[in-house]
Amino acid sequence: MRYLLFVTVLWAFSFNLIGEYLAGQVDSYFAVLTRVLLAGLVFLPLTRWRGVEPRFVGGVMLVGALQFGITYVCLYLSFNVLTVPEVLLFTVLTPVHVALFDDLLNRRFNFWALAAALVAVLGAAIIRYDGITGEFLQGFLLLQLANATFAAGQVLYKRLVRKYPSELPQRQRFGYFFVGALLVALPAWLLFGDPQRLPAGELQWGVLVWMGLLATALGQFWWNKGATEVDAGTLAVMNNLHVPVGLLLNLLIWNQHADLPRLALGGAVIVASLWVNRLGRREVRA
C-alpha cells in the first residue's frame, strides 16, 4: 500500500499545481500530450522491447490508452459542460467501477469490496458535494466513462501481471503503457488542441516537466505497481483518498478555503471504508 499512499500525495499535489498554473491558461490536450511524451522518455531506456509476451504488451498498451489516454480526454471535455463542483462530485464513483470491474474479470461478486467502495464514495461526496446545476447529463456520462476507463486500466494491469509472470521487474515492462496513452493523446491534440494556448513562461513549462517526470512517469508506474500488491477493495478505496489529501494541501500551501468539519468527516468515512474492506476479508477467510 506504500506505493498507493505515496502516489496519492503526489497526485493530490499535482491537482493543485494544475489548478494554480495550468487550468484555463495552457491547452489541456497539449498538457496531456506533453506529460505522455516526457513519461515515455523516462521509460524508453528502461523498457525491454524484445522477448516480452506479445499479449502482455498489447494488454499494457490497452491499459495506457484506457487509464491515461481516454480518461484524460473525457475529463477535459467534461469541463465544457459542468461546473467544477459537479466534476469533483461525479469523479467520486471511481471506487465502484474498480470493484465492479474486478468482479467482472474474476467472474464473481464480492459484496464487501463493493460495500467498501460505496462507503468511500460517501466520504468523498461529503467533502466535495456543493450542489449541482440542471443540465449535467452529458458531463455526467463523460465522467462516468472517465471513471470506468481509469478503473478498468488499474484492474486490467493487476490481472495482466498475475496472468503473465516474468523474471523481469515491472519497470522493464511498463513502457508500453505510455505507447498506448500516446495513441490516444496525440490524435486528441491534433483534433481538439489549440496551438495558440501553449505554455507562456518558464513556470508553466516547469510545472509541465514536473507533471511529466513525476506525476505521470513515476506516479502511473507506482500506482499500477501498488495495485498489484493489494486486494480490489483496498484499491477501490484508495482511489478516493486523494480527496481529503488534495483539499488539505490546497488549504495549507495555497491558503484556499476549505470546510474543515466536512473535510474531517469525509476523511474519517473514507478511512472507515478501509475497515469495512478488512472486515469483509476476515469474513471470507472465516
UniProtKB/Swiss-Prot annotation:
Covalent S-S links between cysteines: none
SUPFAM superfamilies listed in its UniProt record: Multidrug resistance efflux transporter EmrE
Pfam families: EamA
Membrane spanning residue stretches: 4-24, 26-46, 56-76, 81-101, 109-129, 136-156, 174-194, 203-223, 234-254, 258-280
Superkingdom as given in the UniProt entry: Bacteria
Reaction catalyzed: biotin(in) = biotin(out)
Compartments where located: Cell inner membrane
Entry's Gene Ontology cellular component terms: membrane; plasma membrane
Residue ranges of domain EamA in the record: 3-128, 139-277
Topology in membrane: Multi-pass membrane protein
Keywords linked to the UniProt accession: Cell inner membrane, Cell membrane, Membrane, Repeat, Transmembrane, Transmembrane helix, Transport
Major localisation: membrane
Function: Uptake of biotin.
Record-stated family: Belongs to the drug/metabolite transporter (DMT) superfamily. 10 TMS drug/metabolite exporter (DME) (TC 2.A.7.3) family.
Entry protein name: Probable biotin transporter
